[in-house]
Amino acid sequence: MMRLRSDPDVTIDEITSVVETDPALAAQVMSWASSSYYASQSKIRSVEDAIVRVLGVDLVINLALSLSLGKSLSLPKDNPQSSTPYWQQSIYTAAVIEGLTRAMPRELRPEVGMTYLGGLLHNFGYLLLAYVFPPHFSLICRHLEVNPHVSHSLIEQHLLGISREQMGAWLMRFWGMPEELAIAVRFQHDPAYIGTDAHYPNLVCVALGLLQNRGIGHGACAPLPDALFERLGVSRDKAEAVVSKVLEAEVLLREMAAQFGQA
């Protein structure tokens, strides 16, 4: 999937054959395509059908890649109380980022598929944190519960000397993922970031902030400066409208997140 993701000449047949070699993944793709969230007008009869008529190449690769990477690290059993479930937040964030990206002026707009994948994988460092530091992870969860006004990055730096964003960015690079993804993961909570490929972390930052304002997510919510919206070419009102539209499909998005959790 990583090779296909980086191949500009990838064909439908190549993607179909890779998906079909994994029965669980093939069933998942069929399930996504048949979901009422994508509103297919007719029955989906094959993986190729799902890709060509409903989901498209980019979305299938990104969803399958996220699912495959997610399988490599299991969800932690311990979580901060009142936190949004991992895949639920990932799906919401990706959906909002997709809407924000499409709302950007064409001359500023980054690759939609890449920004969507950045949303799906933005919190992957959380899984890595739980996997690498299991004894410390529970301690981090307890600190987050009693200090909801403090950024998780500060707590993690205090207890471990490293944050989930740093770990997640390292893992993206270690796995040979596109550099845009590593940057999106590393700088997702920095509204002032204007470095290389800034649109990717800026989009994650806006999506996370707006969702937190609607009660989705966990922890301290830093204000989103006007300059951040200006760099993306999207007004604050338009961005809020994107979030509202995504949340109209909340039930369907939760179903999709549940499928990720069961895979």
Predicted regions and their residues:
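Conserved alpha-helical "signature site"
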Residues: 1-141, 148-224
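Terminal helices and disordered tails flanking the catalytic cores of nucleotide-processing hydrolases
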Residues: 226-263
